[in-house]
Structures are given as structure tokens and as C-alpha cells.
């Protein structure tokens, strides 16, 4: 449950070429004393790293998103699994080793809880947010971030799966949340009852078993057509089960970016 960051200082001699260290402990490592079963979260997937521009706070930061789940034992029901989205504000700064040696490591308790909430304010001093999954749900695949929205799939085993020898199909849910504050992506967010916000964050997938990570596809234009109407909208898919990702623009290739330049 540890997240590491490394800075590569080009042109330096080998002894000073790389600096780095742990910046977050989201599982048992971050618990003082003996962790409970609830706190023993396991992580099997690489973090989903994206550059976010927060227009309200007029700043940019790196969002590091990752979910917990015991993939080696998907029927395990002991841990209280969560989805985490950390904030690293040192987007354009190369940190010296002394900064990593004294780094204030992000713990689970440092993050703002957004489950059962809407329009949560994540301030510039907050280290990020977390979403506690409903009971028995876990995340067994990587998330993906597009257009400041995070897409990820959770899995919950059949109610009797842990007590039987049969595999069971289980149920998969597709989540779609704001990368900025974890809000559900809905048109009525200003009036949405927080009590049903978690339901609005997810949809039930038809496929059983452990579903793969979501992916975003950008189909080629229709070759037999001319004009803007021929452009195909982006398409999100989890395996062969596809969905509307909620945005229409095609990606813009960015080869580099600079501090102060949007």
C-alpha cells in the first residue's frame, strides 16, 4: 500500500541522478500499532497518474489514483476497501533527497472522505480524497482518467461465494467520478441528495467474473462521409461492454508542458 515518487535529474553524476522516497502509505504500513483486518488493504494495480487543472483554485497538480482489493483472493470480505486519489502539487519541481527524507507521508486519515457526499471542497492544503466502497466491494483492475473524470470497475462476490467451492460470477460496477472532488458525474449535482450520491456514481455491468479495466476508444471518422458530422464520438468500454464516457472532444497530443502555461 505504499506509493513512491522518484525524480530523475538529467546531467547529474550517478550518485545524484535519482532522488525519491515513499509519499503515501494507504494500507497496513500507514497504521500505528497492529492493523485490523479492515485496515489491511492490498494493492495489485499500478496507480493512474494524470495532470489536473483545478480552475476554481487556479492551480495544477498530479492526481495519483488507485484502488484497493485482494485480487489473489477475490472472495475475501475482511478489508474495508477504498479508492484513493492523492494530490501531488510538485508538478514541475524536482525534489532533492533531503525533501524526501523529511516528506510528510500521506496516510489514509489525511484524506477527505467523499462517499455519501456531494460538492465536497478539497482545499489546496488537503492531500487528496478517498471513497470508501460499499461493503464487500473491491477494486481488482486499474482506473483510467480522461477529461478530469475517473473511471474504474469494482467487483463484489456472490453472497455465498466465500462459503462454497464454486467460483460464482459476482457483480461488477462501473464508477465514474470527478477527479477533482469525487463527485458523481450527473447534470443535477447542485440538487442531488447526498444520500443517493453513491448510487449515482456507479452503474451495474452485465458481465460476471472479474471485469478488466475501462478503456477509452476514439474511432476513426467515417471514410464515406465529409464534414464534422462524420466524426465518431469517443467510446468507453469494459471488455466488450461499452458506454458513453460523457465527453465529445478528441484528445489533443501534448508533447510537453510548462509551468504557467495552460
Regions found by a protein language model. Give the residues of each.
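Beta-propeller fold recognition
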Residues: 1-262
Amino acid at each position: 500500500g505504499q506509493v513512491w515518487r522518484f525524480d530523475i535529474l538529467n546531467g547529474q553524476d550517478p550518485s545524484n541522478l535519482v532522488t525519491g522516497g515513499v509519499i503515501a502509505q494507504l494500507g497496513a504500513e500507514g497504521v500505528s500499532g497492529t492493523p485490523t483486518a479492515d485496515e489491511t488493504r492490498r494493492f495489485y494495480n499500478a496507480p493512474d497518474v494524470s495532470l489536473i487543472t483545478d480552475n476554481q483554485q487556479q492551480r495544477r497538480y498530479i492526481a495519483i489514483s488507485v484502488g484497493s482489493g485482494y485480487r489473489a483472493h477475490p472472495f475475501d470480505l475482511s478489508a474495508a476497501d477504498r479508492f484513493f486519489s492523492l494530490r501531488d502539487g510538485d508538478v514541475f519541481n524536482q525534489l532533492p533527497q533531503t525533501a524526501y527524507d523529511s516528506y510528510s507521508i500521506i496516510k489514509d486519515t489525511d484524506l477527505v472522505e467523499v462517499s455519501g457526499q456531494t460538492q465536497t471542497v478539497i482545499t489546496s492544503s488537503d492531500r487528496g480524497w478517498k471513497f470508501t466502497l460499499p461493503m464487500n466491494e473491491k477494486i481488482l483492475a486499474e482506473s483510467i482518467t480522461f477529461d478530469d473524470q475517473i473511471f474504474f470497475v469494482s467487483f463484489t462476490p456472490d453472497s455465498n461465494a466465500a462459503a462454497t467451492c464454486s467460483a460464482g460470477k459476482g457483480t461488477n460496477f462501473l464508477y465514474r467520478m470527478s477527479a477533482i472532488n469525487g463527485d458523481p458525474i450527473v447534470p443535477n449535482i447542485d440538487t442531488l441528495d447526498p444520500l443517493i450520491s453513491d448510487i449515482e456514481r456507479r452503474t451495474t455491468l452485465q458481465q460476471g467474473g472479474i471485469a478488466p479495466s475501462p478503456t477509452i476508444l476514439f474511432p476513426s471518422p467515417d471514410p464515406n462521409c465529409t464534414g464534422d458530422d462524420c466524426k465518431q464520438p469517443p467510446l468507453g468500454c469494459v471488455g466488450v461492454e461499452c458506454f458513453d464516457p460523457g465527453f465529445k472532444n478528441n484528445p489533443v497530443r501534448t508533447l510537453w508542458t510548462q509551468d504557467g502555461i495552460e
